[in-house]
C-alpha cells in the first residue's frame, strides 16, 4: 500500500504538541505516529511533506519539516471546521522517479477518498508528479 512509504511524524513534534493549548491546530490534527496511522474516514485535508530536492539541480539535503510542523501546529484555526491529518513524510527514493511514483500514487489515493492533499517541501518538479 502506498501509505507504507510515509515516515511518521517525529516523537519530538508529538511531545511539542502535547504542551500546546487545546485550541491550537496541533490539538485538532490527527497524526501518523510511530505506533498509529490515522483513520482517513471523515478527513478532509491531508498534510504530506516531501524530502526531495534533486529536481531543482541541488544536492538533496533534508528539509526542516520538524521546525515547520512545530510552527504550524502552534497556530490557531480560523472559523472553519475541517478535519485534517498529518500523514508524515515521503523520503527521497533511490532515484527521483521513485519519489515521483510514490507521490503520484499517494495523491491519487487521497483524491479517490475525497481528501485534499497539502504537499509541503520538495522542488517544483514534484508538481508534475501530482498530475
Where are these regions (language model features)?
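Metal-dependent C-N hydrolase catalytic cores
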Residues: 2-131
Amino acid at each position: 500500500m502506498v501509505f507504507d512509504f510515509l515516515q511518521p511524524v517525529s516523537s519530538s513534534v508529538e511531545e511539542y504538541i502535547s504542551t500546546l493549548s487545546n485550541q491550537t491546530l496541533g490539538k485538532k490534527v490527527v497524526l501518523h505516529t510511530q505506533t498509529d496511522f490515522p483513520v482517513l474516514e471523515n478527513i478532509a485535508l491531508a498534510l504530506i511533506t516531501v524530502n526531495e530536492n534533486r529536481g531543482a539541480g541541488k544536492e538533496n539535503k533534508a528539509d526542516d519539516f520538524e521546525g515547520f510542523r512545530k510552527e504550524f501546529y502552534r497556530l490557531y484555526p480560523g472559523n472553519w471546521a475541517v478535519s485534517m491529518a498529518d500523514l508524515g513524510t515521503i523520503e527521497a527514493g533511490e532515484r527521483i522517479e521513485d519519489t515521483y511514483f510514490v507521490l503520484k500514487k499517494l495523491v491519487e489515493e487521497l483524491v479517490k477518498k475525497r481528501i485534499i492533499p497539502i504537499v509541503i517541501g520538495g522542488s517544483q518538479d514534484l508538481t508534475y508528479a501530482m498530475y
